[in-house]
Structures are given as C-alpha cells and as structure tokens.
C-alpha cells in the first residue's frame, strides 16, 4: 500500500478541527478568564503534525466563510440542521488567527466559498504543479478528492487514506464517492439523498453502474437485479430523480475555484515548529 510519506503539502480542514477543539477543551480558560480551548486544541493538532513530519515545510489551514454559498441557493435546507457558532468560540477566532500569523502558518478563507471547495481546488491546483498533498480531515466528503498524489490523514483513526483503502473498504473509486453520497444522503450536511436507500444499496448500485447518470440510464434493469426490495428501490429512484441529482450537486466538491496562492506563501519559517506553544503560553497568561 503506497501513501504519501515525504515532504507533502499539509492542508488542514480548519473549521472541522476548530469545532472539534472547542468541544474537546470547552472549559479551558487563560489566566484572565478568557476561553482558549479551541486555540489550544488547534495548536495541539499543529504541534502533533510537526512531530509526525519533522521536515515539514509547507502547510496551510482552510476555514469556512460565514457567508452563504451556492449550495444554500440550490437547497435552502442545506446545513440548516446546524446551530450557529457558540459565542465562546467566536471570541477565540481572532486570537487564533493572530497566533497562527505569529507562528508563520498561512490561513485562507474565501468569502462565499465553503472550505471543502477551497481545499479541493487548492489540492488539485498544487497537484498540477507536481506537489504531493496530505489533507488533514475526517470529513467523509473529502474521500472524493483522493488520488495518487492527494491522500487524507484521518486524525481520529490515525491513518492515511489512499485510493486502495477506499477501494478495499467501500469497493468503489474515490470519485464515485460523490454518487454514493448523492444516493444515500448525508445527515451531517443535510443532503437529502434518495429515501430508503442506505449504505449497502448505494454501494451495490455504484458497483454495478459506477455513477448516478448510468443508474438512471439503466433504471428499468434495477427491478430485476439480485437486490433486496429491488422493485421498490427502482420506484424510489424513479420518484426521486430530481432529489438524487440535486444531492449530487450538493455533495460534489468544486475543483475549479480560482485561488491566488503561490507555493512560497505556504512555506514555513525555520523557527515555526519551536515557536508554536511559546506563543500560546503568552496568550494563556495574558
């Protein structure tokens, strides 16, 4: 099994780990009583990356924009199941950005563009320049981005996800993960999917037909497949074609967002890894 080992560009799914850090260390405060758990958690993640990749030279953290995106226009219920950012987390955003700037780590937020789309577009942009990319995220949407040169570091499971691992676990190619999510939906992002189609059925259909388009081109064949409740599944697909195609558009990460980032912009300063927690200690005691 081959995975990226030497000097990759690290792209961190900042918003995902910002929330995870906030809830993991929600009671942590500095000496002035200001909340700092999210900051601590993010810096801890970065520090662990420095320890894992001792010769790390290129890193960038991508954050979501607060503005609505094209997906909200396509589907007004998109991510509507999520609550607004807690005030105690909002208070930590600006200090975190200031600390990351002092450390020398580039951050990027593009107004009106989701972090997933920025990560996808930047990854493919850098891949075209001959770079190897390691995306730090445990968001399953990211699996569609995996190529020979783009891997996912799943921090929760402490493993690197390659095309081979996706094929072994799901039996589908990374790019087919979009169709998979479109069929079964994604409760996390409120992507509807097709009613009554779960993981096993979605994987069966993708294995058989590869994508949504081929499924609907062969819709009359589905009722005869060796699949439990095949006739009902065929009916569900017919009755929910627009919903399936909408879900595909919602699940598909954009790869063509223009991003004005040069490789030199994300190269670390030599002092960076030694500086990480010293700067945090200064904030903690302020």
From Swiss-Prot:
Pfam families: 5_3_exonuc, 5_3_exonuc_N. Keywords: DNA-binding, Exonuclease, Hydrolase, Nuclease. One of its GO terms (biological process) is DNA replication, Okazaki fragment processing. SMART domains: 53EXOc, HhH2. It comes from the Bacteria. GO terms for molecular function: 5'-3' exonuclease activity; 5'-flap endonuclease activity; DNA binding. Residues 172-270 form the 5'-3' exonuclease domain. It is an enzyme of class 3 (hydrolase). 5'-3' exonuclease acting preferentially on double-stranded DNA. This is 5'-3' exonuclease. It comes from Buchnera aphidicola subsp. Acyrthosiphon pisum (strain APS).
């Amino acid at each position: 099994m081959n995975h990226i080992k030497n000097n990759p560009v690290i792209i961190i799914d900042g918003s995902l780990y910002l929330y995870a850090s906030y809830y993991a260390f929600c009671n942590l405060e500095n000496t002035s009583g200001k909340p700092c758990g999210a900051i601590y958690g993010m810096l801890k993640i970065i520090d662990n990356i420095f320890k894992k990749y001792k010769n790390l030279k290129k890193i960038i953290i991508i954050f979501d924009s607060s503005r609505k995106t094209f997906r909200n226009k396509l589907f007004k219920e998109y991510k509507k199941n999520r609550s607004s950012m807690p005030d105690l987390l909002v208070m930590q955003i600006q200090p975190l950005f200031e600390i990351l700037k002092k450390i020398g780590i580039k951050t990027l937020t593009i107004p009106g563009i989701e972090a997933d789309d920025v990560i996808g577009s930047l990854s493919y942009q850098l891949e075209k320049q001959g770079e190897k990319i390691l995306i730090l995220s445990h968001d399953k949407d990211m699996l569609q981005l995996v190529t020979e040169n783009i891997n996912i570091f799943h921090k929760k499971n402490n493993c690197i996800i390659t095309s081979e691992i996706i094929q072994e676990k799901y039996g589908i190619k990374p790019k087919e993960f979009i169709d998979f999510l479109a069929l079964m939906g994604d409760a996390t992002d409120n992507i509807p999917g097709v009613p009554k189609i779960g993981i096993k059925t979605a994987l069966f259909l993708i294995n058989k037909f590869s994508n949504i388009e081929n499924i609907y081109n062969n819709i009359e064949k589905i009722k005869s497949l060796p699949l439990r409740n095949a006739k009902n599944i065929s009916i569900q697909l017919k009755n929910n074609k627009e919903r399936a195609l909408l879900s595909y558009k919602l699940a598909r990460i954009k790869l063509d967002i223009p991003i004005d980032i040069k490789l030199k912009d994300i190269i670390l300063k030599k002092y960076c890894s030694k500086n990480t927690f010293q700067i945090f200690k200064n904030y903690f005691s302020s």
